Swiss-Prot record:
The keyword Cytoplasm applies. SUPFAM superfamilies: vWA-like. It comes from the Bacteria. This is Regulatory protein ViaA. Belongs to the ViaA family. Homodimer. Interacts with RavA. The keyword Chaperone applies.
Amino acid sequence: MITLESLEMLLSIDENELLDDLVVTLMATPQLAFFFEKYPSLKSALLNDLPHWKETLKQRLRTTQVPPELEREFSCYQRSQSIDNQAFQTRLPAIMDTLNNVESPFLTQASQLITSPERTLGQKVTSGLHALFLQRWRLSLTLQTVSLHQQLMNQEREILLDELQQRLTLSGKLEPILAENENAAGRLWDLSAAQRIQTDPRLLLDFGTFLQRQPALQKLAERLGRSRETKSILTQEAPQEAFRVRVREPATVPEQVSGVHQSDDILRLMPTELVTLGISELEYEFYRRLLEHRLLTYRLQGESWREKVTERPVVHQQNEQQPRGPFIVCVDTSGSMGGFNERCAKAFCLALMRIALADNRRCYIMLFSTGVVKYELTSEDGLEQAIRFLSQSFRGGTDMAACLSALLDKMDDALWHDADAVVISDFIAQRLPDEVVNKVKSRQKQLQHRFHAVAMSDHGKPGIMHIFDHIWRFDTGLKSRLMRRWQHGKAY
């Protein structure tokens, strides 16, 4: 079987010119012209796809087989080119039968050429007539091939136009939410190429509208997303300057058993002391030790952190900005993060996705409660994954240690080794294991990894939050929400 591309090559038909005509016709359609006028930032992104479209169409030509009738006629034409006038005259009846059997458009013209009035019956076929016959036959084959090419391209044009309309409609709706600049518009256009976006994108639009009504949350995401760490160059000067350090010390609020000590706390008596109280000979001994605060009791003690100001030599530095890496965002989906906290956390992730698209970065989401669920919002099917993420419900417990362990494992990947880690939570959770804390501190010290905390509550445990480099606070309490709404309304 011969392909359409091979037939065009054998007939010296320029397929590139035909493909260029198709692209020009496609770009001039009123539907695309309307979208380009409404969303000019998407036009340049679409034009970048033109080479890919042409290559796709060429691949279609390579795989499309010509009809058997046309292939049979072309084979007959090729054999007729390599014979002389006498052999051509001998085979002329067979050629006419072939043209008749394949119902060739050239049949009528061929009959007129061989039965012309100037040619007497039985007269030999001259070289001029032979050349004219082959020339007209080649022209007929060329017209048939071009017609077949046009039919195929028209089908592809309709398919491509339908796909472009769907992508432009989706990209146009999401452009105000996700396209901050030309680079973001281009990446949004690439994301719209996913062929299986089955979920309604209205979730993205709803959270985009919610984010616009929370300018403080959007500003916080901008500050976190645009922040850069610096590389320090040391100098020789080292003056004394005040230095603040967080110091851990025992707290008065009991949290856990930390040992045994002597006291008069009846509620925390050890069982051995209660035994002496039940023996009449030792009862007075029990009361004596009670008065002397010498009863063995459990010691319950908590931890708290305070700032301690000291002075130490500080070396002056010159700072060089480091390039921004991707985001790995851990979102707490426990029951305490439901309601308004849930909407704020999802909108914050949407804002980080917008920044990632604008800065050509990647954005990876990890949801944690009693398990860990993962989404990459900037992958090829990022829009579908973003919609699935926004449709998640927040309920369950809080296993922050498992999420941080999964985050650290992800940062071992070469593609994510310079990522910024962001944890969004109310930080009302159990104490982190020392192993996880030590791993985080090791990465901060040795690899300069950055860990950010976005606190959705003022009641988070300091013992958990102290491991983060930066703590970004967004209070979701009723009073703070009313104050932000009042300030937002006053600004307008």
